[in-house]
Amino acid sequence: MSKKAFLFPGQGSQYIGMAKDLFEKSVEAKEMIKTADDALGVNLSYIMFNGPEEQLKQTEYTQPAIFLHSVILASLIRTLQPEASAGHSLGEYSALVSANAIQFYDAIKLVRARGRAMQQAGIDNPGTLAAIVGLEPQKVIEICKESSAVGIVQCANFNSPGQIVI
């Protein structure tokens, strides 16, 4: 017997037209999308289906869009009955809904609030992220310390032994 798990993506997997095919072909998907639009008080589906891309890239829209798409897909294939659900960053919220740990309606509002807070944090504290691939963690830490002489540079996340985000 094989075991199954649902894995959900974080921010960055958004694209114009996401979930449009599901909306057009699935009553369940259409209902979930309409519920999300109502819960958020914004026409998120229009932004997802039509853009503009610059608006979809704004964290306050990106995060609920990716969450919504992920949860719809999980719902449509729920008969696979996964033993586990996990997600990267934003994907953790989709995993919680998939595991029935939180209700969809509550989660979509929570994800929107998260996206807004993160967008505001980026405005208040401008910066950028970069993934460093193939260097030893200690070397990246040393380079960050040296670079901090001219600005703030620090390790933000150790994604894997071969990938560190600064």
Predicted segments with their positions:
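General structural signal for alpha-helix termini and helix-helix connectors
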Residues: 21-24, 96, 120
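Generic anion/oxyanion-binding catalytic loop in active/binding sites
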Residues: 18, 59, 96, 129, ...
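Helix-rich "cap/lid" substructures immediately adjacent to catalytic or cofactor-binding pockets
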Residues: 2-86, 166
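Conserved alpha/beta-hydrolase "nucleophile elbow" surrounding the catalytic nucleophile
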Residues: 87-88, 158
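Alpha/beta catalytic cores of group-transfer enzymes, especially the acyltransferase/condensing modules
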Residues: 11-13, 40, 99-165
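A broad detector of short, well-ordered amphipathic alpha-helices
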Residues: 34-35, 68-72, 92, 105, ...
